[in-house]
């Protein structure tokens, strides 16, 4: 992600509402990134693991982070990184809040 211009701010942010794997900045955007790994597709693709329930949990945790950091009015988005073996897929703006 750093090679793509992301500035990594925090790994494994945790609060009482949940966890976010990676928080970064991409230009003006604060990016909340979920990273999912699968050695193979027997358990489904890593991207399928970020279901609606997981998305809501990430969203609530991100809003908590922004409030905690007094960043309520900054633009943000939710990206997902799927890793299958050696293949890495980045989906920018994978879901909304």
Annotate each PLM feature:
Residues 2-4, 42-45:
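Solvent-exposed, charged helical/coil patches
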Residues 3-16:
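A short acidic/basic microdomain associated with nuclease active sites
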Residues 15-17, 26-28, 84:
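A generic beta-sheet turn/junction motif
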Residues 17, 30-32, 75, 88:
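Structural motif
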Residues 20-44, 58:
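Conserved catalytic cores of phosphodiester-cleaving nucleases, focusing on short active-site segments
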Residues 50-55:
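Short, conserved glycine- and acidic-residue-centered signature motifs
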Residues 60-67:
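A short, N-terminal amphipathic alpha-helix
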Residues 68-97:
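Domain-level recognition of nuclease-like catalytic cores that cleave nucleotide substrates
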């Amino acid at each position: 992600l750093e090679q793509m211009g992301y500035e990594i701010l925090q790994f494994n942010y945790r609060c009482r509402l949940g966890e976010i794997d990676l928080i970064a900045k991409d230009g003006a955007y604060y990016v909340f990134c979920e990273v999912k790994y699968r050695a193979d597709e027997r358990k489904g693709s890593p991207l399928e693991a970020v279901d609606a329930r997981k998305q809501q949990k990430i969203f609530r945790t991100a809003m908590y982070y922004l409030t905690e950091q007094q960043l309520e009015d900054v633009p943000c988005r939710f990206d997902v990184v799927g890793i299958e073996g050696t293949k890495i897929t980045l989906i920018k703006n994978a879901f909304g809040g």
